[in-house]
Every structure is written in structure tokens, then in C-alpha cells.
Amino acid sequence: GSDDDDDAAPVATTAAPVATTAAPVATTAAPVATTTAPADESAAEEAAGADGVLAAVCPSPIIVQTDWHAQAEHGPTYELLGQDYVIDASNYSVTGTLVASGEVDTGVDIEIREGGPATGWQQTASVMYQDPDIFLGYTSTDGAVEASADQPTVSVAVIMEKNPQIIMWNPEQFPGVERVTDLPDDTPILTSWMATYLYWLINQGIVDASQVEESYEAGVSRFVAEDGAYGQQGYASNEPYIYEVETPEYGKAVQYELTHDMGYETYSQ
């Protein structure tokens, strides 16, 4: 599952410091253009890609460090891989030709690396500063701000407009509860130590520090064993499906609340 700080993040380079305030998050999906590019423009772009023009200006491979296991939230990046990709399971990475529009060879390769457990739970900025060959990295707004004093990064793209970070629970254990603030005061909230949003939730009185257990490692065993009798971090685009469809020993819907809807509006992937 994600992280899930996990649990999603703008892609960043390792240049100048980021802003110290979070960017606003749109609550609706961005409009999709209804017209196509002019034929001559598309042809020119395809010709440039076919000539491998990026080889003259880009490193190869272009290394992208993600913030978690390979998952749907990273889909746009994995879509850049050509059909010749090779998975290196021992190093939690995949490498292949970088293609544009799913078919145009750009002349360089792309290597995508997993984060989270694969990097010892380090923040992406920390990993990037240890390895200068990393070209881009997934990080959240709050993660970038947190690391900005010693490891500044520049945000260059946003993958999702609304943060899918959630806290979830079994609705059978907490009938009628729809928000985290409605959970009993002694309900444990299980997260990873990278979950920086927790400090805000505690500061706002949404959860109490005594409830927080920073021991989440993306497994399903505890949630299954305790039948979801506590709050746990996740992604709306990930864990609900995993627990209901891919975890037969649980096999039912979870209830959750987005941290965005709690008022914590940041970019994440």
C-alpha cells in the first residue's frame, strides 16, 4: 500500500529552496483540452523525439526517485517507460527507453526507483542529496518544506490536484463514524514516522498525540488481525481497494476521511 505519506507529490529537482507555505489544492479536476495540437506541431515534436534529440541535452538514464512502492499514483511516470523495460527487483527499480506519447523514442533511458521501505523510509529530498545522479523525485508539499532548510528542492510538476492521503477504519467497529474527530478519544491512529501531516492534525486538536503510533510499515496483517479497530493511514486511491478486493481475509469496505477534507490542503504526488 502507499504510504503513504504515504501516503501522493510534486516532482522536484535539487536546486533552490522551496516556498515555506503550502500551495492551494484545487478541489476539482483540471479541465481537459477539447482540441488537438496542430498537425504540423505534432509532426515536429514527433520528428524531434524520433531523432533522439533529448540525448544531446539530458542525462541517460534520467533517474526518478519515487516516494513509495510502485503504485497507481506513480502511473504517469511509469507510462514513460518503453516496451523494453527491465525490472531490477533486488534494487527496487525499473529501467527502459524513455518514450513520449507512448511510442516516440526520445533517445535516452529512464530509471524509476521505489521509495519508502526501499530507501529505509527516508524522505525523498534526503535520498536525492545522497545521490546527485537522481534527476527528479516525488515529494509532498509538507515534506519539501520540512527539508527545505538543509535539503532545498524546487517543485516543477504536480501529479494529482487533491491529496489522496486518508485515515481509515472499519465502519463495523465504529458505527456511524464518518470523520476522524468522531472516533473515540482513545482510538489508536497508526501511521509511518514520515507522516508529517500528523503534527498539523495534533496541533488542530483533530487527534491527540497519545493516540499516534508511528509504526505503520504498509502491511495488512495488523489491520486484519484487529478487524480495523483503529485508525490507519492510507491513500483513497489504494488501500480501500486493497483491503476489500485483494485481501480476502478482510474482504470488506473501509471507512475513511481525506486529510484534505480535514483542512490539511497540500500537494502529495
Question: Residue locations for each model-derived region?
Answer:
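Short coil/turn segments
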Residues: 67-71, 161, 170-174, 188-196, ...
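Bacterial signal peptide processing site
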Residues: 1-4
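A local structural motif
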Residues: 58-62, 85-118, 130-133, 186, ...
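Pocket-flanking alpha-helical
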Residues: 73-81, 94-154, 165-178, 197-201, ...
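Immediate post-signal peptide segment of exported/extracytoplasmic ligand-binding proteins
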Residues: 7-10, 23-63, 148-149, 173-186
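A structural signal for short loop-to-beta-strand junctions that line the ligand-binding cleft
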Residues: 62-63, 151-160, 165-166, 178-189, ...
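Extracytoplasmic "Venus flytrap"
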Residues: 54, 61-83, 117
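Pocket-lining segment of extracytoplasmic ligand-binding domains
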Residues: 142, 217-222, 227-269
